[in-house]
Amino acid sequence: MNQIGFHNFRKFQSFPNLDLSPITIFVGENNAGKSTVVKAILSVLDFLGTEIGGGDDLLGLRFFFNKSFFTHVGTFQRALNNSAKEGVITFTASNGLYRIQIEMEGDKEDEQSISAQISEIVLTILPFNIDLDYKFKSGQDRLIATFHSTPSEYYKDLSAPYDTPAMRENYHKARVKYFKDMTKDIEVEMPISNGSLSQGRIIEVLLDHFYSKVEATVKSLNNKAIDLFSNVLIINGLSKDAEDFLRSKRALLLQKPFVELAKNDVARRASFGGFEYIYAHAVTQTVIYSAKDINDYFVRTIHDFANQRIEKETEVYKFIVRWMKIFRIGIDYEVSSFGGEAHIVKIKNSDDRIVNLADKGMGSIQLMILLFRLASMMANAGIQSPGQRRGDYTIIVEEPEQNLHPKLQSKLADLFLEMYELYGFKFIIESHSEYLIRRTQILIAEKGFKSDEELKDFAPFKVIYFPGDDKEHYDMLYRTDGKFSNEFGPGFFDEAANLAFKIF
């Protein structure tokens, strides 16, 4: 995900589209809205990752607020902004390949309703700037496909998921030819129609539905055949412009690279990638970690990691040991399992002494849990070597600086940067750590960006400040020298200086 926006959700009546960087850090006052943005992201990712199809009906799609354990929303009424005039919530998100807007309606007076009816979804295929506007309201249900004649402002070539140089070249040629031939926007209206759906995530299903409509329509036009009894063929009602467009673009719409490449990476990208929420959690100095305590995030992380059975000399193992040394936790580790029902974690210190993880400080325990969770995600993504960017994962971390010495807080920035640059994982961080923020400034300065444009396109970090008092959030905006163009609100960076001034 590289963009999120919403209306009438939780704290915000309107939250304008926010562009996310590979590592986006939310800072600011308490109750300023950081958690609302995180809940919005989690809610959207959960919806996009849900499998539909089979017996499901496109016209009956619903958005559930009680499926994600992490969002803690539960009902539509709790999700809806208190000042909303109508029971309508809208989310907008993008991942560089697709942009999706989801509108839902619910009963604002119903305290028990756990879902809302999807009233409209606008899915944009960004490389070709095609809007698929699915209107689901009863009596108004239809698909309006708009083929734009100019590229989308939201699409950047550098953000597209190319697997090979050849694929990139084919994709580029197809786009150039497509827009060169387009002289004006073309709108094609089609009935949605009930019926069986392909199995998959929502974006996959909508794309399959769209392509099947286009294929049937183009073939019917080509054969000059109209099947009035089919709920797929939609020749009647087409404008002359739409007919001419579909006829002239037959080769492109039905053959490679449009269909195959536009659908390429759908399996990985349709849900906007995998995600993990590492929320602020307690740690305990317990020697044995029982799998029966699986509802405890701390214990579940150890249990999940143990089940990965990470072997020595693998990239994941090297990652853990490398960062254990950087964080001064130890120089090696061992996880022992008892019938898969309980685990013990041992740490090897720099003096070769073996101790239980429970005998380390709370900060070291906290960091090992973070490393184990990141390592599990690396293993799930099939990471086998540095530079193998299997990303498409968004990791949301809440207050990772808990229990950490300031020096170690700053090193978290290096950890997140390595996870992105070497392995492709993206992060959204909720933090109050001045030391973490200061370290990102140094890392930006060390990149040596030559211009503001280069900085904007390639800076790995972004810091968003939430000032509270219902004031609008803003981007702190790094400069090429690492300094910020904007100022933090009072009580963040200046609090230590203010207290020192009072002492003197």
Where are the model-predicted features located?
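Switch/communication elements of ASCE P-loop NTPase nucleotide-binding domains
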Residues: M1-N81, E86-T92, E313-F504
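P-loop NTPase switch/coupling surface
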Residues: M1-S271, A381, P386-R389, R438, ...
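Generic alpha-helical secondary structure signal
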Residues: I102, S138, L158-S159, A166, ...
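The feature marks a conserved, polyanion-engaging helical scaffold used by nucleic-acid processing enzymes
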Residues: I234-A342, M377
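Residue-level signal for secondary-structure boundary sites
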Residues: L97-R99, T286, K471
